[in-house]
Amino acid sequence: MLYLASRSPRRQELLQRLDVPFQTLQLDVPELRAADESPDQYVQRVALEKAHAGLALVQAADPDAIVLGSDTEVVLGERVFGKPVDVDDAIAMLRELSGRTHQVLTAVVLVCAQRAPARALVVSEVAFDTLDDAQIAAYAACGEPMGKAGAYAIQGRAERFIRHLSGSYSGVMGLPLYHTSQLLTAFGAH
């Protein structure tokens, strides 16, 4: 059985598009970046920790379990933008992203007891239009930025702010479907 180690409704929705049966695991894995950790190392480590935590949870009951862990972070330079803690934090993030091109890093990891983990790191570039304070305040007030890395949802109202995207649209949402499908096929789960 395939298990998704994620609370994200977007990841659940995206994984359903691959027509692979799966169950969702509700896990709390700390997402704290070490001072000497690069953004790509960080996102890959968190995805691996989520997958391993999920495997530890289900392995006794399902020895053949395959667990998918994923993490997405918005990066501008060396700064990693996590999920905003409140509306003011969302506004600050959106002001920094306004008029600039940032990266969205999404790591996907598959683990099981029988083999080494399979991994993918997908890097997308997103160019934001220049936003004025009224646009930022209105978007932050709608609630959509909360719970989203970088304080925006590309699949939602923020799509109108995206001047250019290079990379994986589904990766920016939280689960790059092409790469996930390739990993699942290599693991024999697709």
UniProtKB/Swiss-Prot annotation:
The active site is at residue 71. It is found in: Cytoplasm. One of its GO terms (molecular function) is UTP diphosphatase activity. Its EC number is 3.6.1.9. The keyword Hydrolase applies. It is an enzyme of class 3 (hydrolase). Keywords: Cytoplasm, Hydrolase, Nucleotide metabolism. It catalyses: dTTP + H2O = dTMP + diphosphate + H(+); UTP + H2O = UMP + diphosphate + H(+). Its main location: cytoplasm. It comes from the Bacteria. Its cofactor is a divalent metal cation. The record marks 10, 72, 155 as: Important for substrate specificity. Gene3D superfamilies: 3.90.950.10. Pfam families: Maf. CDD domains: Maf. Nucleoside triphosphate pyrophosphatase that hydrolyzes dTTP and UTP. May have a dual role in cell division arrest and in preventing the incorporation of modified nucleotides into cellular nucleic acids. HAMAP family: Maf. This is dTTP/UTP pyrophosphatase. It comes from Xanthomonas axonopodis pv. citri (strain 306).
